[in-house]
Amino acid sequence: MEIKRCGSQPSHKGPADWFTGRVRVDPLFQANAPARASGASVTFEPGARTAWHTHPLGQSLIVTAVCGWAQRDGGPIEEIPPGDVSQLAPNEKHWRRAD
């Protein structure tokens, strides 16, 4: 068993080629083989957003605070309020932003 203590892993600014606006990424856990799942807490300042992107294995996102918005390629912009879970299929092109 491995325990990651709160605050023990360094935060970093979201990279400019992935995000527009102020975004902070706090790692929670990395995948340990054979697992492939990792997790992070990503904080968007109001108006910040991701670039259009995909995830080869899909992605699950839990909205924990403030209202977010998401759009998949060819789809409508959808609201994702706190408590909602957004799941994407592998390679589904999308973006997300916060208000």
What name fits each language-model region?
Residues 41, 60, 76-78:
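Short, surface-exposed secondary-structure edge patches
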